[in-house]
């Protein structure tokens, strides 16, 4: 194993490893690194395996199947594991081709031995949420080698649930490990300021909006189908109503339907939850080339906006506020369907992107200010 290179900034998030190997998690870290590269900040993505991902691993489901003598479910979960391992390999290949990532994979224990990073940036996602196993001290820079380094939290999320009294005490303590903090949930800014007792916290936009669509086009797979298609990006919670509406819309408009499955909840049969075996580059290509996009995925919406696609957004039960946040930041709340009938109307992307210009510029300035010593070549 090669030694780790000394880096000014270590990016830590759900990057290479996330529940079900989420495409959005990989792409927000890719985008954040590319933006730091553009502004001249030496950085590396830490290959970090969070404990919550391990707790949600299908291996645990297989173990419980064995204990309960559920052998049919065990067999189906073994097949699911095979699917996930293939997807994991595609993620590894993506990061190897497109990102600067640490040579070694770290967990919260081995992360304590990483001493080649000048400061850490905890980069977006639900990194500050109380997940299975509690808070992740790696994400909260609460390890001895991570403290006192002017760390930055960029557009982090603590989930949509209210924070308990005990968790509030912990978060207030953990927040002291960071010199600068921004969150992505526009509905909880004042609430979070009160929780951690800091007034310097601000809102920033998801990292995928920090770089241009051309940066994604460069890595997107070229998609060639004989017929135009509706893309259904079904994420986290299986939404059968969304699928039905997509097929109805496709039939009415003489379009094919392509589906990306990336969900873990609300499925009737285990085999329904098997992930679509495609790589990150193909996901980008499918979104870029679709005629219409139906999605309950937060990052599905983000890339629908980036590629200026006509899309319809659907709510989720869990952490729906992030979907509402991105729609509001682009003044596109009318794209949320819920129980409404599909009423097609073209999106005015000039207006939508002008509306979001201020928050995008503010987010870039936040990063530049937080890391200005590195940009200027200081210590």
Predicted stretch roles:
Residues 152-159, 192, 234-235, 240-279, ...:
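Catalytic donor nucleotide-activated moiety binding site of glycosyltransferases and closely related
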Residues 201-209, 213, 262-265, 269-296, ...:
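Donor nucleotide-activated moiety binding/catalytic core segment of transferases
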Residues 117, 178, 290:
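An anion/phosphate-binding loop that grips the pyrophosphate of nucleotide cofactors and donors
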Residues 223-237:
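Conserved donor-binding/catalytic core segment of Leloir-type glycosyltransferases
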Residues 329-379:
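Leloir-type glycosyltransferase catalytic cores
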Residues 286-326:
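A donor-sugar binding/catalytic signature common to diverse glycosyltransferases
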């Amino acid at each position: 194993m090669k030694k780790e290179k000394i880096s000014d900034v270590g990016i830590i998030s759900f990057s290479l490893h996330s529940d079900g190997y989420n495409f959005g998690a990989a792409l927000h870290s890719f985008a954040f690194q590319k933006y730091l590269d553009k502004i001249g900040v030496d950085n590396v993505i830490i290959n970090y395996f969070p404990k919550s991902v391990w707790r949600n691993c299908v291996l645990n489901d297989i173990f419980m199947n064995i204990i309960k003598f559920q052998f049919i479910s065990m067999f189906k979960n073994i097949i699911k594991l095979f699917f996930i391992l293939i997807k994991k390999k595609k993620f590894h290949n993506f990061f190897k081709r497109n990102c600067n990532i640490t040579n070694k994979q770290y967990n919260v224990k081995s992360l304590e031995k990483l001493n080649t990073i000048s400061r850490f940036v905890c980069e977006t996602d639900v990194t500050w949420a109380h997940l299975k196993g509690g808070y992740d001290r790696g994400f909260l820079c609460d390890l001895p080698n991570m403290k006192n380094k002017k760390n930055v939290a960029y557009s982090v999320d603590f989930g949509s649930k209210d924070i308990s009294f005990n968790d509030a005490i912990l978060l207030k303590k953990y927040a002291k490990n960071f010199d600068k903090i921004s969150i992505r949930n526009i509905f909880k800014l004042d609430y979070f300021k009160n929780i951690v007792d800091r007034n310097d916290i601000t809102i920033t936009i998801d990292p995928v909006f920090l770089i241009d669509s051309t940066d994604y086009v460069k890595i997107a797979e070229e998609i060639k189908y004989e017929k135009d298609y509706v893309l259904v990006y079904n994420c986290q919670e299986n939404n059968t109503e969304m699928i039905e509406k997509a097929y109805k819309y496709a039939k009415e408009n003489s379009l094919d339907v392509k589906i990306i499955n990336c969900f873990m909840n609300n499925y009737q049969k285990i085999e329904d939850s098997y992930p679509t075996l495609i790589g990150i580059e193909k996901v980008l290509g499918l979104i870029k080339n679709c005629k219409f996009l139906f999605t309950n995925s937060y990052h599905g919406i983000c890339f629908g906006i980036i590629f200026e696609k006509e899309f319809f957004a659907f709510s989720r039960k869990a952490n729906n506020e992030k979907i509402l946040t991105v729609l509001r930041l682009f003044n596109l709340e009318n794209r949320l369907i819920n129980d409404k009938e599909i009423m097609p109307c073209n999106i005015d992307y000039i207006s939508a992107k002008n509306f979001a210009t201020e928050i995008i510029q503010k987010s870039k300035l936040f990063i530049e200010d937080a890391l200005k010593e590195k940009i200027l070549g200081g210590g």
